[in-house]
């Protein structure tokens, strides 16, 4: 996991970004300038590659890329109105704000790499997928172990010439096979 990114590093990046790239809408520039001017807001800002799963996010685009110029969302509400976004950012300054920036060569920019963070919600999703894979592996392992133990018990019943136990264990084996189909 990446070390914490300082407020000054984030502010320096925003200033560099605004000097280097022209936003598709001037309101996007205003919002970024406002954020950079308030340490208490910058503290809660996270630059991410995608906003999937984030509760509150801002997607901004510079000229030269094919993306929406300005999108703000909070929960299930999405808007392209910069004033609504500005007011939410101003009034809820102590809530996490995830920002996705679209600009030419974003993924190869060392300045952006310095402040970019992993989306924690995407990581949770991956963890869930890994959990499902682990659960499936455990289920399969337990079934294989149980089946092997049952086959051994069937062999033991045959060796002991115990028909009642043999038939009982074979029924269990057939039930097991039906569940796996």
Curated annotation (Swiss-Prot):
InterPro entries reported for this sequence: IDEAL_dom, UPF0302, UPF0302_N, UPF0302_N_sf, Virus_scaffolding_prot_C
SMART domains linked to this entry: IDEAL
Family (UniProt): Belongs to the UPF0302 family.
Designated name of the protein: UPF0302 protein lwe1947
Organism: Listeria welshimeri serovar 6b (strain ATCC 35897 / DSM 20650 / CCUG 15529 / CIP 8149 / NCTC 11857 / SLCC 5334 / V8)
